[in-house]
Amino acid sequence: MFIIGQRWISESENNLGLGIVTARDNRTVTIRFPAAEEERIYALAVAPLIRVQFQKGDRINCIDGWQLDVEDVLDNQGFVIYLGSRVDNGEQVALPEMQLDHKVSFSKPQDRLFSAQIDRSDRFALRYRALQHQQAQFQSPLRAMRGIRASLIPHQLHIAKEVGQRVAPRVLLADEVGLGKTIEAGMILQQQLFSGRVERVLVLVPESLQHQWLVEMLRRFNLNFSLFDEERCSDFDKTDEDGNDISENPFESEALVIASIDWLEKATTRATQVLLADWDLLIVDEAHHLVCSATESSQAYQFVARLAKKITAVLLLTATPEQLGLDSHFARLALLDPDRFYDYATFIAEQKAYKPVADAVANLLNDKPLNDMAKNAIAELLSEQDTEPMFKIINSEKSAESDRLQVRQELINALIDRHGTSRVLFRNTRQGVKGFPHRVYHQITLEMPDQYANALNVRAMMGSMEPQDHFYPERLYQCLNSQAPMGNRWEDFDPRIAWLMTFLKNHRDEKVLIICKQAEIAITLAQVLREREAIRTAVFHEHMTIVERDRAAAYFAQIEEGAQVLISSSIGSEGRNFQFARNLVLFNLPDNPDLLEQSIGRLDRIGQKNDIQIYVPCFKNSMQIVLAEWYHRGLNAFEETCPMGSNLFAEFSETLQSFFNDPQATGFEEFIAKTSKRRQQLKMELEQGRDRLLELNSNGGETAQALAEAIAQEDNNPHLVNFALNLFDIIGLEQEDLGEKLIALNPTGHMLVSDFPGLSEEGTTITFDRQLALMREEIELLTWDHPMIRHGIDLITSGDIGKCAISLLINKNLPAGTLLLEAIYVVEAQAPKSLNLTRFLPPTPVRVLLDSKGNDMASQVAFTSLEKQLKPVNKQMANKIAKMAQTQIKKLIMLSEQKIETKAQAIIIAAKQQADNVLSAELHRLTSLQAVNKNIRADEIELLEHLKAESLAQLTQANWRLDSLRVIVSNKA
């Protein structure tokens, strides 16, 4: 019966919103849909309409914008009035149904079922699987570590896991060059973000590394950082009509920020704004530039010190922690833990005291007997343990090798836990990490063209000569001869180009990376190689967008039809690694050792399978050859990493400059010998200062190896592949198998959502193969941690997709018309993300399968086997079933609520027990270690105590809700 003013919805056109009866006669009813500004006239006998009536406990929207919590429902001659209290002010009001908001949405599965918003059965299945996978991923110990687009390097994974799971980590990451500090920092950051402990992040880097960090964070971790500079910040500077400053703090506009510490040193207003903004995590790269001694500290150090006081989590990165002296090293440790590192003299004394322990550890590692000095050093550090029986086993020739191995490992583990800086400082060295190739240097000495010599003479006569002119004569010539005719341009006579083309023809089957100083040189070189020798060439420079660089990198990476050569400007290649190539040509020699190492580091990474061949073409009697000789014979910087390179560069810069001014001056050989001797001296000091105990703690050993293997086993996981493809199919993405383990995803016009996370308008190419993704940077590597999967799961579980469905069960053993109810409940704790309770109690789906008598058959009938027997029902038939069986379905829903309580309570109790066990064990370990290791911060223990108390309290309040349901009706065929 239709009454004017009643609210109805259309079964076939849910998108019209909530309709209102405006007229009726003996044969028809007229419904107006204000939200869609549409009107429909239906025949009374077959009107596809459903009456909308809310129930006690529902929250409904008024047309005026406020909400009402329904406490009672009155029926006034077929017209409904809702009684309850307003959400905004608590006022008790009556709301006639005519005043309901025209845009209605039903979120409860039972409401959707009875309002003709029934979904397909395969979407219900996808929703349940999404909930299952979400639960599994929240509890996975590999979460936030397997999604990185990088090789699985054990020591990196170990540091990331050890630090990333801490509450408010404050550490110094000091791995040597090429061992992946940026990756370690990114994985630590990823874990902190995933756990909810961190939301706002500030990364401070030298200006030259800004783009490298931006690219690394995006390409390796799918983290969209924003680069802040003066131009960006000035957009937030505002004044009102009276000239009063009403500027906003630009650093509050983004959550993930990268800024140059060099810029902030000069821009005091911006530095103040950084300090005024709230941050959860601070990352500082190249932290050895933070100089501090007993008498003075740099401006950069003071600025970072102020930030470190107010930001709870801090990561400092440096490849050379003691490069500028132990006092600066101590000062950086004091930034991290001022209570622990309060006195420099005490710190020095402690460092000396650990020397005998480090020597003892070396003996333990080499399975050598321990002398009295070593035993005394170990016994003093492990004073709470009786170590004598262990020493006897180690020193006795009669001891079984397995016993000695076990005791040695126990001692090493105990010493690591008590090591002076092992919780604050992590350092791996190339000696301690295997897998690096050799570097082979080839110096190509060429005659300087007369054109360059003349250009240099002209510049000298003009009195405006600069060192850059000697290092990059092609730029000088181009500047002086900008209108040079064809055949007389620099690329027409430079002998480096002739050598390069011959070299490339002789190495046709090998990839070659060429690094130039400037983008213009790279572009010109590429054009010459293409036009003269048809050499397939890609270009990489700072004026290209990230997408353009991706395409160039992909072209270079292709094996069959890819580019033989990638020509890059020195800035353009920052953050990009090309381990699949082994030939490096430095067309322009970098003008300082750090830049040289950065260039070689594009190929010299963990994962490089071949020896790296480094070619440097340079001119006789030039600055270039002086610098090349000094790099090679003085620093040995081409064939070995030179961590002391910048120190030596600063120490010998004046003498080096004198030879730049006169490359043929006498005494150069003595200068080379002096540099080499000093390098050997510094290298020996570094080697003697190696802390094997620290390296052991940083390396992770067998545990780290097992972690890498566990992640490798998850790569190409069939559950992930099947779920992802099913997700993309149901969402409505077009999928094209490209072969070679590649799938192209493209948006379509019939997608369930207009904007799928991670999918660009042009489409996205994906793979589940890590090695392929490492070679092809334009391809997305899909893992459980990838945004397309994580946000795809969120899209399904937090929306209405698959919330209710109706299916036919083809089973000859059941009477036709038998009704079953499959209800999916979710047990969860509504708590602050920072508690990271999802590791103990993630949103957990619990399945209840009731027969018509109310018996729960979930344990007897598996979801997958039932799914195979189900057939879809068209929408019209589904609506009829929902109407006809409404009373029975409601009864079964009430029964399911009784069944779920016992199951849910058991899950909550188990989660509380797990949380108590894990947090108590962690607390006990830290408390015990604090007695013997001063590096355990008191605030770290206090935070953990608070975390435990709050976690258990929140888990006590955990609850459950009906997430989705499926009505199943049996049929014979």
From Swiss-Prot:
* Domain Helicase ATP-binding, first and last residues per copy: 162-339
Q: Where is the motif named DEAH box mapped on this chain?
A: 285-288
The record, for CDD domains, names: DEXDc_RapA, SF2_C_SNF
The record's keywords, sorted A to Z, are: Activator, ATP-binding, DNA-binding, Helicase, Hydrolase, Nucleotide-binding, Transcription, Transcription regulation
Enzyme Commission number(s) of this protein = 3.6.4.-
SUPFAM superfamilies according to UniProt: P-loop containing nucleoside triphosphate hydrolases
Specify the protein name: RNA polymerase-associated protein RapA
